[in-house]
């Protein structure tokens, strides 16, 4: 259905242009986009907690736009810029980005108190939380968001 959503979440290792599985397996972002673009829903959201995850846009060069590459239906929220690490915390049991996404979806990102979390609200919360927690490190982390503006007001969760 048109209102359905696909949510893809990856937390693990990353390198420029790809997420990294176990062993020598690489899954390039362009392959993720290619597979997800075939879905009928126009609402696809990918969360990537991996080093260099901001490199998802590296293939979107001057010859085409991100919207053309994704059919204007995929939004990526990435843990870091293309040249940054994505930090983990052993006491949290996951990365700062994953932790912020979870806290945000559980209500912390509800900026206007309407008991709904939109993509824009979640990103604003995640960005503030992660940059604050990593600002004193040698390599601060800056989450990234790219996708069609029509996705920014899509409600990801409500209660």
For the regions a language model picked out, list residue spans one by one:
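Cysteine endopeptidase catalytic domains of the caspase/legumain-like
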Residues: 1-159
